């Protein structure tokens, strides 16, 4: 039986597909955080301003209730936005992980037509207690993955942003 293994960490750090998508997801995550933080600061500022004016008796009771209801709606909208953006980000991350797994499996299927391995294992952390380096095909796999990788125009544009 012919066996080989691939270092997952090396694929994650050297495969261009991973690098590109990691950068895109990192930028997207940062944009989400920045958007939510800015809206949170604006809401806090509006709430502080409201409190100050309430203490100065600048509003009638009806005005204060209307403004407070508006602030509560803004807070609810912010929470809904947070939930929506988090869900969208998770969906995109899941899609990336699926595409990554599919690209690796597709490459290994083609690669293995010539190599004829019975088993190709993934080595991540210490999931393999011992493996002789002679069975390590990581460099070949990473080189082959990178050679086959053709980023979409959409991805290239997102990476360059």
Please report, for each region that a protein language model flagged, where it lies by residue.
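Amphipathic, charged alpha-helical segments and their helix-to-coil junctions
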Residues: 1-161
């Amino acid at each position: 039986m012919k066996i080989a293994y691939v270092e997952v960490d090396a694929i994650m750090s050297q495969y261009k597909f991973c690098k590109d998508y990691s950068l895109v997801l990192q930028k997207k995550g940062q944009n989400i955080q920045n958007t939510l933080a800015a809206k949170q600061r604006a809401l806090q500022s509006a709430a502080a301003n409201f409190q100050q004016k309430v203490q100065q008796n600048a509003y009638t009771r009806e005005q204060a209730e209307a403004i407070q209801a508006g602030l509560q709606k803004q807070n609810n909208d912010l929470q809904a936005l947070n939930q929506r953006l988090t869900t969208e980000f998770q969906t995109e991350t899941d899609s990336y992980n699926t595409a990554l797994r599919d690209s690796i499996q597709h490459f290994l299927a083609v690669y293995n037509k010539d190599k004829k391995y019975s088993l190709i294992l993934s080595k991540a952390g210490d999931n393999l207690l011992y493996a002789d380096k002679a069975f390590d095909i990581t460099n070949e796999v990473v080189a082959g993955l990178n050679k086959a990788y053709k980023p979409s125009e959409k991805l290239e544009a997102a990476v360059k942003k």
